[in-house]
Structures are given as structure tokens and as C-alpha cells.
């Protein structure tokens, strides 16, 4: 018992010594505390040498200097903001009286986007796009001129805010845009057709305004930016009588029209301020702009560009697709001329088909029942393949197979048969006629 009491007393004396009291040096000499602790004690207690018998209490250093805090502090709003994106005006409902929701800054509607290093979900990083891809000269000229013109102040000239790029499916509209953005050093704010519809009325229109203001905030910080909307006609257009035209379709068209007319005064619903935002060029892609609301695509609001790649453009893009496979340029030219009616995307799918043989060899080697264990839960890592040799004959063979699959989809049209006949009806008739049914 006496031993335990003496131990406690020794510990208490050691603690007092750490705080600069008692006899002797303030820092203990025992190796138990280590050199790092001695350094820490010396830094925390500047006046370590004191007279014997005195007891000195040293206050801890201030860890936060209030005078050094700035308005650009990234986390400053955590004490006041209860939303997760500082913009969602619907989360403020029910927390304050609707009469005071907008003008009193009480809720989460206050849409100030100058938060320090704002983290965005719509910002697209294009740093991974490397050299070697072909950019069509006409495409590059149209996009660069439109973006540059929107950042200039031209005398007595009304510049259309929106550039609409439309054309056939799979012709590389979106990818060419990304290549131009990368060449200009622009990280665009991205949207797609799937974001132009919602279960809540007005949400897509509000999202467009939010993304536009986000791009404007980046421009105000000195970074070139643009708003890029993919497949606008798929989300806001009318594709025949079976398409349901909703309030959100109307609101998306009306919002884009309003932004095109007032590009420096884009407000969120319920929140209006007098400060002008930066002008942001908008680039949209689509397949058929005749399905859009006609006043939206008039010349003063939208500049239209029909993208139909020439033979030279198709050959140039295909050289980029096969650039790592060692395919001679004359073979690429012959391949493009063999399938003149196919989209550019067809040649990318054709290249992917060549790897099917390598995948079959790997599956036969590990067994069908072990593919899941090898691919998902393997300690060996993912499988690696030697790059297959792509000869012109093999590419033509797989190309004809893809064309045959396209013809089957157009020719058979089983949906019409299912609607007109009971059960399968004559669904196998096509296979019987082609001779592949009894193989």
C-alpha cells in the first residue's frame, strides 16, 4: 500500500514538473518520455527555467487566430448553413414562414456560389484527353469562334448565347466538343438529357439556372468555362405523338429562352439580387432540333451548326481510333470506304469486337464457372491481354457482322408481330427463311 502511494506521489510530482514547478529542470530526464515529448514540452512552455519552490501556470497557445480568418474560408458557412449544396431552395421550406423565406436569408435558398474552391458535381475535367485524336477543322472553327465571341464585347452586335450542334447519331458530336474544350483549356459544366425531367415540377429548370450560375462563378474567378448540355432534343423535344409533353419540358424551353435573352441576369426561383453574373456560352447537342420549341432555336438565341463529317473527317477520326493498333493508313482508308453509310461510332464498336477472340480464349482457360472469382474477387488483379493483330481482313469480317445485326433489327421488327399475333406467332419465320433455324 505504501509503495502504491509513493508511486502516485511520484507521478503527481512528475506532472507538476511538466508544468514548470518543483525543483530542478521543467522537462523530465527520464527516457520514458522520449525526445519528441521533451521537444513538445519545451515548445509549449517557453519559460522553462524557474526558481525552486515557485509554481507557474502557463496558458495554452491560441490555436486559431481570429484576425487571420477571411471571408474566403472554405468552411465558414458550416456554422450557419444547414444544406449540403448551399443552393437547394426546397430544403428551406417549412423552416421559416414562406413570407420571409426569400428576402430574410433564413433557410437554405441563399444562392451565393463564391464559396472558396467550390466542389462541383457538374464540373467535367478533361485533362485525361491526350494528343492523337483528330479534330475536324470546321468543327473546331465553329466552336472556338462561338465561345470566343461570347467573351468579347462587340459594338452594336447581339451575339447568340447558345450554339446548337446537331446531326446524325454516332457522328462524334459530343467527343469533338470535348476535344475542343481540352484544346482551349476549358473545363465545362456538364448536363445531359436525363437531368431535364423530374418528378417535381420546375426542378430541371432550376437545375439549369444553378449550373449556369456555377459556370458564371468560375468565370468570375478567372477560369474560362461553358455550359454543355448533351442531347437536348431527347430531354426537351417532342418525338412523335407518343411523347408526353410535361410542365418540365415547357419550363426547360422557357428557361433557356430567358437565359439567352438575359445572360447576365440569371436568378434562382424566389431569390433576386441586383448583382450581375458573368456571361456563359451554352453549347447543346442533339439529333433533330425540329423537335424543339421553335422560338428557342430562332437565330437571335441559338446559332445552329449541322455536323456531317466529310470523308476526310471520317478517315482522320478513324486514324485516331486505331492509332495504337498499328493499322496502316491505306487500310483505314479502305475500311472507311467499304462502310460509307455507317456512323463514326461504328468503327469504335468494330475495334472493340476484335477483342472478343482474346476474351473467349481467356474464358476457355479459366472456365465459365470461375469467371466471377477471377474478375471480381481475385488476388492476382484483372486479366491482361496482348494486343491482338488487327488485319484488314479481320476488320472487314467483323464489320460485315455488325452490319448484319443492324439489318436484322430493321427487318424483323418483332414488336409489330407481338402486337398483331398471339404468342410467338411466326417470330421464327425469319430464321427459317435464312436457313439458320435448323443448324
Curated annotation (Swiss-Prot):
Species of the source: Vigna radiata var. radiata (Mung bean)
A Pfam cross-reference name: RuBisCO_activase_AAA_helical
Family (UniProt): Belongs to the RuBisCO activase family.
Protein name from the UniProt record: Ribulose bisphosphate carboxylase/oxygenase activase, chloroplastic
Keyword terms of this UniProt record: ATP-binding, Chloroplast, Nucleotide-binding, Plastid, Transit peptide
Record-level GO cellular component terms: chloroplast stroma; thylakoid
Gene3D superfamilies: 1.10.8.1070, P-loop containing nucleotide triphosphate hydrolases
Cellular localization per UniProt: Plastid, Chloroplast stroma
Key word Glycoprotein present: no
SUPFAM superfamilies (alphabetical): P-loop containing nucleoside triphosphate hydrolases (SSF52540)
Transmembrane helix listed as a keyword: no
